[in-house]
Amino acid sequence: MAMQDTLHALADPTRREILNLLKQSRMSAGDIVKNFSVSGAAISRHLSVLKEAGLIRDEREGKFIYYELNTTVLEGIMLSLIHI
């Protein structure tokens, strides 16, 4: 994923808050939605942007999808920024 796409995903405060939540533990989409005052559809879109940027990954368990941080991408971004 291009750094530009990743930085675009990080630019949104709601997406950064989702990453903060996922820093603590993996969560289902429903659990993530409970922490915000926006619609489930809006959170779903934010999750899609984060996933496309490689910042999170998902895993289906039965009828639920759980999201977790992809720390490898975050570490790569930090290293790239240090060397600018």
Predicted regions and their residues:
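Residues in the helix-turn-helix
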Residues: 42
